[in-house]
Structure formats: structure tokens, C-alpha cells
Design a protein with these regions (language model features):
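Short helix-coil-helix linker/hinge
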Residues: 16-21
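Residues within the DNA-recognition helix of helix-turn-helix
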Residues: 53
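Alpha-helical DNA-recognition elements
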Residues: 56
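Short, Lys/Arg-rich nucleic-acid/phosphate-binding segment
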Residues: 67-76
């Protein structure tokens, strides 16, 4: 089976979110857009390390980078909420699967007799 583009996007998002530092960066950026320096201070990370993490988040489409009109050197980072939709959709499918499995298990546990099985 050929992977779909959505599969690549989902894999990139999960890969980017697999790192605790990047998840913390996302949490901070959900509060408000931030400059790289401010973000580095919040997560106590060197500018070089922060740059590597931001590159992964941008490549996955989870974070965008914007310039400031008056100063081309200043970069503002913000979360791209729409990039999380494939993750949310996949999680909803998994949740639905588990809900159905647990309902079936509950029904079996509440009525253990199967048709054609002798009473004990």
C-alpha cells in the first residue's frame, strides 16, 4: 500500500512532537507568539539548540516563522493550529477503536454465556 501525503504529514508531526523540549516549545507558543530569544530563555536552551528544534517544528508544519516589519533580524514564531488536525483526526480514530473494543469487552463480561454453550 502506497503511503498517502497525509501519512507523511502525520509522521512528521509525531516525530516533531516526540521530543519533550519541542512539546514545551509548542505549549509556550500556544500561549502567545514569541521571539526566538524569548523562547530560548523560557526553555533554557542555547540559541543553536533552539534553532535546530524550531527547524524540526517548522518542517513538520507545526510552527511558522514571521518577520517584523521594522526589523528583518527579528523573527516571531507561532503555532500553526491547522497542522494539528491530522493528529487530532488520527487520535479520534484510535479513541473510537478503543471505545468500541471496550464496549464489546464489557458486553462479553456482563453476559459470559455464548449461544450453544451448555449451562454450568
Amino acid at each position: 500500500m502506497e503511503p498517502r501525503p497525509a501519512d507523511f504529514q502525520l509522521s512528521a508531526a509525531f516525530g516533531a512532537l516526540s521530543d519533550a523540549s519541542r512539546r514545551e516549545m509548542i505549549r509556550l507558543l500556544l500561549q502567545k507568539p514569541r521571539r526566538a530569544g524569548e523562547l530560548a530563555e523560557c526553555v533554557e536552551m542555547s540559541p543553536q539548540a533552539l534553532s535546530r528544534h524550531l527547524r524540526v517544528l517548522r518542517k513538520a508544519g507545526l510552527v511558522s516563522e514571521h518577520g517584523v516589519e521594522n526589523d528583518a533580524r527579528v523573527r516571531i514564531y507561532s503555532v500553526q493550529a491547522t497542522a494539528f488536525q491530522p493528529v487530532q483526526q488520527w487520535m479520534a480514530q484510535v479513541e473510537d477503536l478503543w471505545r468500541r473494543q471496550l464496549q464489546a469487552f464489557k458486553a462479553l463480561a456482563e453476559n459470559p454465556r455464548r449461544p450453544g454453550r451448555p449451562k454450568t
